[in-house]
Each structure stands twice: as C-alpha cells, then as structure tokens.
C-alpha cells in the first residue's frame, strides 16, 4: 500500500514498532464509532443512522467531528482498517461518505458468534456495502466466507527480567470464562503453584500492554483460556513462544501449528 492507512480502534502498541517511514503513513483514530453513552443518542442513532441518508454535519451528533473528519480525508489509494466493526447501519452511514477508491477493511479479533446476533446475515450486508472482511479464526473464515488473517505479535525492544516471580500468569477480561478461570486457578494453587491472575471488570481497568508483557515475562507459564467455539489463536501462544514460556491452553487447534511442542504446551481437553 502506497497511500495512507486510517486505523480505527486498533491496539496502538501493535504498530509502534514500525519504521518511521511507515508510521508517517498511518493515522490512528480511537473507537469513535462505538455505542453512545447517553440514552438520547442511543435511541436517535438506532432510529436514524443508516436508515436514511444523513449528511456529515448531522452525523456529528453521534460521531465525534474531529475523528470523523480525519477519516473522511482519505483519498483514492488510501485504506481504512476498522477493528471489530459490527453495526451494519453505522458502517452503512460511514461508507456512503468515504471517497471512491478508498479500500475499507474490517478485522475481527474475537469469535464471530460473540460479535454478532445474526452473523451470516449481518456479515453479508457488510460485504455488500463494500467492506473487505477478515478474521483471526480459521473456522469462522470458512464458515462465513471471509478472509483468514493469522494472529500477530510484535516483539518489544525492552529487556526481559531474569528471575520469574510466579508460576502461572493470566491477564484478560472474564468474558464467558470466569468460572473456568477460577477453577483452574484453584487447581494450580492446590498443586503448590503460584498464580498471577489479572481479571479486570472492564477494558478501561486493565493494565497497559507494556505492563502486561512485564508481568508475563516474570512468570514461568502463560494461561490461555479461549472463548467457546474458538479455534483462532489468541496472542498468548505467540507471547509464550517469543518469551520462551510454557503454555496451558484449551485450544486444541494449537496442535496443528509448526511451533507446537507437547513438552512445554499443555492442552486442557
């Protein structure tokens, strides 16, 4: 890609290691397309956005002017990448304002069934709007006829601490796996293993990725508990691989990867 890349709501740390030349072509935008906080904006957006044609000035009601204007500065040859875009009407309203010749991508880094109520129907609608869709999960890619884009990881430049301070490390939102995580933690501690489990209630309460990697590096083993019906790799197996850590995972699909080693990877079946 020779033009600019406008990235919406993606984790910034993934792109921080790019060369200055590539960084100059990236425009980072926060998740300004997310659900409004006030009841009035929630109701009016549900009733109007994407259902009738609305000019940009009206869309400012729901989407912050600064960021919408930035995204719509894209020109032919540029590209837009939206993480987890799932509201069909919002994507429809935005797409109608994007100049022709701008490629629009959406990347799903969570299982599709956790993102959509009607996955097949909604994904087809989004594709018909002109968005190119991809997912981290190979089964979802096959099931919904979208592109598969494997998991990614950027190895940081920071030094790795020498001595681990815990045996097992997990950090992530509970989602639908809190009972499984609690049971595993109790099992590990019963077997005299020290656990460092960080489970914030919301994403805003979580630690930074730099701190996350520091905590991971201070542990001997990484815990990887996937959501139900997930086959795509999370970033944890890659982090364990690059940091030379053991891994406990419930993702059976990991055994098909060439880096799988049964001596250091424990599958919870």
Question: What do these predicted regions represent?
Answer:
Residues 1-75, 83-93, 108-238, 246-259:
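Nucleotide-sugar donor-binding catalytic core of glycosyltransferases
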Residues 77, 262-263:
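Glycine-centered loop/turn motifs
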Residues 80:
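Short acidic catalytic loops
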Residues 99-104, 131, 243-245:
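A short helix->loop->beta-strand "cap" motif at the edges of active sites that frequently abuts
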Residues 264-269:
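Conserved acidic donor-binding segment of nucleotide-sugar-dependent glycosyltransferases
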């Amino acid at each position: 890609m020779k033009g600019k890349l406008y990235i919406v709501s993606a984790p910034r740390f993934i792109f921080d290691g790019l060369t200055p030349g590539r960084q100059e072509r990236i425009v980072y935008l926060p998740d300004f397309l997310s659900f409004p906080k006030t009841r009035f904006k929630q109701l009016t957006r549900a009733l109007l956005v994407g259902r009738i044609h609305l000019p940009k000035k009206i869309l400012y009601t729901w989407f912050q002017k600064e960021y919408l204007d930035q995204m719509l500065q894209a020109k032919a040859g540029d590209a837009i990448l939206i993480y987890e875009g799932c509201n069909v009407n919002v994507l429809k309203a935005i797409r109608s304002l994007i100049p022709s010749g701008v490629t629009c991508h959406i990347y799903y880094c969570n299982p599709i069934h956790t993102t959509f109520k009607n996955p097949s129907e909604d994904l087809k609608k989004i594709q018909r709007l002109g968005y190119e869709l991809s997912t981290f999960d190979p089964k979802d890619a096959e099931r919904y006829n979208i592109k598969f884009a494997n998991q990614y990881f950027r190895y940081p430049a920071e030094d790795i601490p020498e001595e681990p301070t815990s045996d097992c490390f997990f950090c992530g939102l509970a989602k639908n796996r809190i009972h499984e995580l609690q049971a595993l933690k109790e099992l590990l501690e019963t077997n005299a293993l020290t656990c460092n489990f960080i489970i914030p209630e919301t994403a805003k309460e979580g630690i930074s990725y730099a701190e996350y990697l520091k905590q991971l590096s201070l542990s001997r083993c990484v815990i990887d508990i996937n959501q139900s019906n997930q086959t795509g790799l999370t970033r944890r197996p890659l982090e364990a691989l690059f940091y030379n850590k053991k891994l406990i995972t419930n993702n059976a699909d990991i055994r098909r990867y060439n880096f799988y080693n049964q001596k250091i990877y424990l599958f919870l079946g």
